[in-house]
Amino acid sequence: MTGRARARSRGRGRGQEPAAPGAQPPVSQEAAKPVVSTPSEGQLVGRGRQKPAPGAMSEEAMLQISAGFQQVKIGERGGRRRDFHDSGVHTRQLMEHVKESKTGVSGTAIELRANFMRLLSRPMWALYQYHVDYKPPMESRRLRSALLFQHEETLGKAHTFDGAILFLPNKLRNAETVLCSETRNGEKVEITVTLTNELPPSSPVCLQFYNILFRRILRILNMQQIGRHYYNPDDPFNIPQHRLTIWPGFMTTILQYESSIMLCSDVSHKVLRSETVLDFMYSLRQQCGDQRFPEACTKELVGLIILTKYNNKTYRIDDIAWDHTPNNTFKKGDTEISFKNYFKSQYGLDITDGNQVLLVSHVKRLGPSGRPPPGPAMLVPEFCYLTGLTDKMRADFNIMKDLASHTRLSPEQREGRINRLISNINRNGDVQNELTTWGLSFENKLLSLNGRVLPSERIIQGGRAFEYNPWTADWSKEMRGLPLISCMSLDNWLMFYTRRNADVAQSLLQTLNKVSGPMGIRMQRAVMIEYEDRQESLLRALQQNVARETQMVVVILPTNRKDKYDCVKKYLCVDCPTPSQCVVSRTISKPQALMTVATKIALQMNCKMGGELWSVEIPLRQLMIVGIDCYHDTAAGKRSIGAMVASLNQGMSRWFSKCVLQNRGQEIIDALKGSLQGALKAYLKYNNSLPSRIIVYRDGVGDGMLQSVVDYEVPQIMQSIKTMGQDYEPKLSVVVVKKRISSRFFARIDGKIANPPPGTVIDTEVTRPEWYDFFIVSQAVRFGCVAPTHYNVVFDNSGLKPDHMQRLTYKLCHMYYNWQGIVRVPAPCQYAHKLAFLVGQSIHKEPNMNLDDFLYYL
């Protein structure tokens, strides 16, 4: 898990049930609890966001209805689901040209299956909401429930009740039903149950309810919730040689799609490490010694996600309580109890190291009834297991290979896992009873649908056009020996190397000269500069040798240590703006691979200096394509970096790039408004005219942020365009690009379940009726399942046909110059990602504006 997905998962597990000791007012650390107290009864997401259709309920009514699920256990509700906010965003109805149809026509038809199952309900199914009154009033919620459900014969077995609002799958005989109950001490209580709302199956509250119900089903199947997803601890994959365990599981969501309410279910894996946090701390202390241990421990542990197996909950480590040990006490009810005794009495666990310090996890969610959070959770390292992988583990080829053997599923394996889930749902009696009482069921097969495979593109290079194998989506062989569109001659460039790498530096230089000729690149011999293998020496060598007229700097690094790489990029991107290429010596140390590596390096160097490699046919004239992405920089005070890349020419081979650091709380588009104006001025300078059509691909939009893009970012983009002249009104399209999705598609090719071919478009069945959206499978993968990309056109006054929008989007996936093949997203999105990542990871400052016209970040 990376990026935004990781950010979403950090923090206490979304589905944690109350664990003793119970909820109390906020406490100081002296009285902090060893495990989280009762989580908040958070509000239903998606409330009031959907614009009411004619006859639909008001926002006020939605708020009232939503309150009815407040007391369903938060574990069942699955935590705060931001994707429900997005389901209330209606954009298609504002675009006249796609109101009737948003489907394309190009390409050849292909039969597909998708990881979706239809939710079926009995005819005329509805969810009925009732308000419940007690006379005399009853304070205890538990007592109110007990008194009400003395009348199960009248109400039925299926019900959800929060103490005031009742939901039933069946309509009671009368709009107002009066019931009489009796407390244990003989007090008579009159209960009035009044019908207040009848909710259709596709209402937002019903959709929320289906998801709650499905989480209940997963628990009946003995699956454990960790974070937002459910995993099976009874069927783990153990990798003992690396001390790792994998729990298989599923990520699920139920939403309204084009013509059906469907469950989307995809395979998920939770990687657990066999070592506890205490084991890790012991090992770290041995490595760094007592004096450096506190600092090193804080650096290594804070921010990590851990799992406590005694309750299968995940927590984010926010701090370390160096003055707390298991012998400290906290208040449980009216008595003081030590952490040590608490774990013994509550879980039967013995703490072996009484001197271990405690971990702190802040509970940010509000307490019941909107009260402040219940205070930090204090965790015992001995019972906390590390999750996920360290950077060192990710860099270990053997670990990643062994992990992939369990987690990188083929299309056949992935479909098989999902089919097994369907089978388990249909075979389990308890699950069927739960569904039947609510009048619901799931279709017992995956959804079948039709897609289209777009025609493959012809690659234009050196005055020629050629085709490539559409199944591999790669043209590295086809472009060999062909001159590039435009080449920058290398007359003044430097190569830095250490004494140990002198031989590989010479080999690289000779091979670069050999491969550059056929491409059309004129390359003079580089000035060779030796530096000592120290960061200060490297920086000094750069400062002394890189001049204003230097065209390119190549640095051969002895290892992939980040500090040396960062040093090079900071100096050459900020202080002394010069295109640069870093190469790790190991990459060029194998003679048999040197020609291939040198070819890729030569291509990158040419791009970074302003050269153009290849193109595809773009029929639209006076078109500017813009890509926007962002990155969260933890080193720069948790500021976000916004990157914008805009095309300057017809062939989409020249780009203007700008990166800005946002202030905390500032919207990305506020920071990038000036960048868009700069791009338009650069386009005007390059073409002697402004673009008549602008298409913005906005990547990096997380769940729940769609409304902000529509309400705030689109008007800001339009305002920014207006600064070029009040009479300047280009046609504008804004497309939200989403990679982190759980939708998967399977084709049957030569009788086998396989990935859909590159260029597969899906724009029916699994798209959303309120959006102008589509999926494209653009790239090919050699192993595992290919992941589609979701495109949601949130604003479009261009009148461009859906077919043209889809084909243009696919064409742009061919234009990323760091890969001789098709990539998963349009090139400007990938460029923006690379730029934001470079600034967030290495530079931490805005790059020098002299580099704006170059792809220096490739």
Curated annotation (Swiss-Prot):
Tissue specificity: Expressed exclusively in the adult gonads; expression in the ovary weaker than in the testis (at protein level). During neurogenesis and organogenesis, expression is detected in CNS (midbrain and eye) and fin buds. Starting from 24 hours post-fertilization, expression is found in the genital ridge.
Cofactor(s) the protein requires to work: Mg(2+)
Family statement drawn from the similarity comment of this UniProt entry: Belongs to the argonaute family. Piwi subfamily.
Entry note about domains: The PAZ domain specifically recognizes binds the 2'-O-methylated 3'-end of piRNAs. The MID region is required for recognition of uridine in the first position of piRNAs (g1U preference, also named 1U-bias).
CDD domains: PAZ_piwi_like, Piwi_piwi-like_Euk
UniProt biased composition (Basic residues): 1-13
Knocked-out gene: effects: Progressive loss of germ cells due to apoptosis during larval development.
GO CC terms in record: cytoplasm; nucleus; P granule
MID region, as annotated region: 476-612
Encoding gene (name): piwil1
Region of interest (Required for binding 2'-O-methylated 3'-end of piRNAs), residue spans: 314-316
InterPro entries (alphabetical): GAGE (IPR031320), PAZ_dom (IPR003100), PAZ_dom_sf (IPR036085), Piwi (IPR003165), RNaseH-like_sf (IPR012337), RNaseH_sf (IPR036397)
Natural source organism: Danio rerio (Zebrafish)
GO molecular function: metal ion binding; piRNA binding; RNA endonuclease activity
Pfam family, any one: Piwi_N
Protein's UniProt name: Piwi-like protein 1
Subcellular location field: Cytoplasm
This protein's record includes keyword Hydrolase: yes
Residue segments, region Disordered: 1-56
Enzyme class: hydrolase
